[in-house]
Amino acid sequence: MICEVGPRDGLQNEKRILSISHKVELIDRLTEAGFKAIEVGSFMNPIAVPQMADTDEVFKRINQKPGVEYGAIIANLKGVERAFLCGCKKVKLNVSTSIQHNLANLNKTPEESIESFKICAETARNKGMDISGSISMAFGSPWE
């Protein structure tokens, strides 16, 4: 299934932080447009990714339509907990093939990330959440 990642990947590096209501409107319009999978945001450190600091509240306010999968990226156990508490039912773990990119995003090597993801995946599964994974920089990296 193709997942629309604009609300997360498209907004996370913007200098201007969109309001919660604008993010909710964007996601609701994507739902109305017929997308079956939408990446709402991420549960990363709010200091590191301030554009995603309000993902918890966005999840609570979007109009979730049956048959549409709403998910988010997590990086650690705190992210799993935040996702669970706001009703997120699908989390994604992401690792980069680029050591420099992975260090910049997660402050860990790809190998360290994969190891730490094991407990995240187990915890999410025990909470009844769906889990997926993704690989960044699979076809090359401008970081190296």
Residues covered by each model-derived region:
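Conserved N-terminal beta1-alpha1 strand-loop-helix module at the mouth
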Residues: 1-43, 51-57, 61-67
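Non-catalytic positions within long, well-ordered alpha-helices that form the structural scaffold/packing
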Residues: 31-34, 84, 125
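Catalytic cores of alpha/beta
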Residues: 75-88
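Active-site mouth loops of central-metabolism enzymes
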Residues: 3-22, 68-77, 102-110, 137-144
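Non-cysteine beta-strand/loop elements that form the S-adenosyl-L-methionine
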Residues: 3-5, 89-97, 132-136
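Conserved, mostly hydrophobic/aromatic
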Residues: 10, 30, 83, 91, ...
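Alpha-helix-loop-beta-strand connector modules within alpha/beta enzyme cores
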Residues: 48-72, 111-132
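Glycine-rich, proline-tolerant flexible connector loops at the mouths of alpha/beta enzymes
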Residues: 36-61, 95-108, 137-143
